[in-house]
A protein has these predicted regions:
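Catalytic core of DAGKc-family lipid kinases
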Residues: 2-20, 28-34, 38-39, 43-170
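Extended, charged low-complexity segments
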Residues: 164-197
Length: 197
């Protein structure tokens, strides 16, 4: 079944209702995968449907994070024949999900990862990715004479920030300008088809 980029409720809810636990393969961008997982979450079948992913870009953060093949034919084979493994789903306080890379940039404010202060002041960017162990990992970047470099790393269940208005990006898509944002690990993992049969 073909759908538009970043499909929504009107395109997905009916086909997803008929899956009955069968595998679902998403071919597209990290943002497309996030849109499908959001619908699985909202229809209550997130943990019941194994999801395969064939990234349309060799630079997919999801493929890099979870060791998925970047060659489409190999990725499709794994998506169709692979075994599922639970991986964390990261949500945000605006009702979205993050499956690859979240970016806030530029940043002037305070950010916490769980109860640890990871930023107080200015940074070029703050990056968040899902993390198998705790739920998410955060990296604070500052620009110096030699370019951007990571100055702080942390992992935890949530990252919260308050700042002067800045831009938030989810999985390569500009989301909004805001002065506060939260990403957190959802209570239920999703089933990624990533282990060879």
């Amino acid at each position: 079944m073909g759908v538009r980029a970043r499909p929504g409720r009107e395109e997905l809810d009916e086909p997803l209702a008929g899956l009955d636990g069968r595998r679902l393969v998403v071919c597209g961008t990290d943002a497309d995968l996030a849109a499908v997982l959001l619908r699985l979450l909202r229809t209550g079948v997130l943990g019941a449907v194994p999801v395969g992913y064939v990234p349309s870009s060799a630079t997919s953060t999801v493929a890099r994070l979870w060791g998925l093949p970047r060659v489409p034919a190999v990725a499709a084979s794994l998506a169709l024949r692979g075994e599922p493994e639970q991986v964390p789903l990261v949500r945000d306080d605006a009702g979205g999900v993050l499956v690859g890379l979240g970016v806030v940039q530029p940043l002037d404010g305070v950010a916490y990862c769980d109860d640890e202060v990871v930023l107080r002041g200015q940074a070029s960017r703050l990056e968040v990715v899902p993390d198998h162990a705790l739920g998410l990992a955060v990296r604070v970047m500052r620009r110096g004479l030699l370019g951007c470099r990571a100055v702080r790393h942390a992992a935890g269940r949530a990252v919260q920030l308050g700042c002067v208005p800045t831009d938030v990006w989810r999985d390569g898509i500009a989301d909004r300008t805001t002065d506060r944002w939260t990403w957190y690990r959802h209570t239920e993992d999703w089933q990624l088809l990533r282990r060879p049969p």
